Amino acid sequence: MKNKFLAIILVIVVTSLLNAQDFSIARLKYSGGGDWYNDPSAEVNLLKFVQANTNIKVNAEYKFVDIASDEIFSYPFLFLTGHGNIVFSSDEAKRLRTYLESGGFLYIDDDYGLDKAVKREMKKVFPGNDFVEVPFSHKIFSIFYKFDNGIPKTHEHDKKTPQTFGIFLGNRLAVLYTFEANPSDGWADPEVHND
């Protein structure tokens, strides 16, 4: 169950790609003091799950890219997580906006304590766009596995209801943000969280 939600996201992103290369995810390295590097086994385990349960060919290696680098344009799927603060310079915000407007996808998982920074910094990226709650009727909750009640809670923090937010560019979900759910903790090696 922990991996299924992001498997849905991967299916959506990958099926929209025309490139025949193996699919991979890059962790987005950012400034500001948040631990962008936490749980490095998460993406590798998720990609292995996707490979074992779908027809998607993956490259299950841990990769990270600096937000200031043009290398972000080499990956259709960027992942941002951590605890604490995030800061985008104006150039980084512009680069991320160009990436997303060019068809890239960003998944943000609040591992705890990122909410204010995520909302503040994404306003630099898209000043005219707010995060909106993704309705349970959206295909992301049913394209591969069915989640009638939205994203499941993986890691308990504050006993709040898990929520899924998005920034849409036209009809396309370009940024997905999970809050109070923390599915990436469920992808990490079991010994990381002792569960």
Residue ranges and their predicted role:
Residues 21-23, 32-33, 41-42, 115-195:
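An acidic, glycine-rich "communication" segment
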Residues 49-57, 81, 98-102, 121-129:
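Structured segments of extracytoplasmic/periplasmic soluble domains
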Residues 25, 77-116:
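Short alpha-beta junction capping motif
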Residues 56-65, 108-111, 129-136:
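Surface-exposed patches in mature extracellular/periplasmic domains of secreted proteins
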Residues 20-21, 70-74, 100-101, 166-171:
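Extracellular/periplasmic catalytic domains that process cell-envelope and extracellular macromolecules
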Residues 60-67, 89-95, 159-163:
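Alpha-helical scaffolding within the catalytic cores
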Residues 19-77, 81-84, 182-183, 189-195:
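Aromatic-Pro/Gly-enriched surface loop or interdomain linker
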Residues 4-15:
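Sec-dependent N-terminal signal peptides
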